[in-house]
Amino acid sequence: MAEQQDARVYSDRRHEMVEQLKRYGITNSKVLEAFNAVERHLFFDAAYRDFAYDDGAFSIGYGQTISQPYTVAYMTSMLVERCPSGKVLEIGTGSGYQAAILEYMGYSVYTVERIEALFRRSSLILGALGLTVHQILGDGTLGWEEEAPYSGIIVTAGAPEPPSALLGQLAEEGVLIIPIGDSTGQRMTVFTRRGEMFQREEFHTFAFVPLIGREGWREE
């Protein structure tokens, strides 16, 4: 009985979250459907699940966060508008929530995580949910070359510049969505591949954890 009551509460909270996303300007029906379907609280430790549907980032340990729902929805909307289907690479698996959203939307999802504890935790969660997300432990700034090219690449951490390895792994007309900037804030930036050239578009400012790796920031 308690589990059924909790399920209803979480379902109501998800609905409230989706309504808030609409008020914030998220209008894509596929994105909203995914956010209403994927149970965000399952990506939180049990002690913190009451915070899962709040509109804020939340620590998942190791200096990393699960991004606030609006940020995830914003990046997902940018992807689906430019790349409605295909093979997508996520840099920074973190909790696994973004990968689950992409999988629900029908993408073939590949994701890279550099922190072993988060890699193992997200693998367990995604596996328990029966999702066929392809995961690897490694330096996300180098992408996943063996599985390239990708129709889209989403980076869930802030970088000083777009890693050349990621640009090189885009398919023709593929898009790289990445926050670019410094520790004070990053502009959400989209790079679209046109042959050996990349069209650059800049959008709103966000605050992400740093992208650590050979082509990102150094670990302090």
From Swiss-Prot:
Pfam families: PCMT. The keyword Transferase applies. Disulfide bonds: none annotated. GO terms for molecular function: protein-L-isoaspartate (D-aspartate) O-methyltransferase activity. One of its GO terms (biological process) is methylation. It catalyses: [protein]-L-isoaspartate + S-adenosyl-L-methionine = [protein]-L-isoaspartate alpha-methyl ester + S-adenosyl-L-homocysteine. It is found in: Cytoplasm. Belongs to the methyltransferase superfamily. L-isoaspartyl/D-aspartyl protein methyltransferase family. Its EC number is 2.1.1.77. Gene3D superfamilies: Vaccinia Virus protein VP39. InterPro entries: PCMT, SAM-dependent_MTases_sf. This is Protein-L-isoaspartate O-methyltransferase. GO terms for cellular component: cytoplasm. Keywords: Cytoplasm, Methyltransferase, S-adenosyl-L-methionine, Transferase. It comes from Chlorobium phaeobacteroides (strain BS1). Its main location: cytoplasm. The active site is at 67. Catalyzes the methyl esterification of L-isoaspartyl residues in peptides and proteins that result from spontaneous decomposition of normal L-aspartyl and L-asparaginyl residues. It plays a role in the repair and/or degradation of damaged proteins. PANTHER family: PROTEIN-L-ISOASPARTATE O-METHYLTRANSFERASE (PTHR11579), PROTEIN-L-ISOASPARTATE(D-ASPARTATE) O-METHYLTRANSFERASE (PTHR11579:SF0). It comes from the Bacteria.
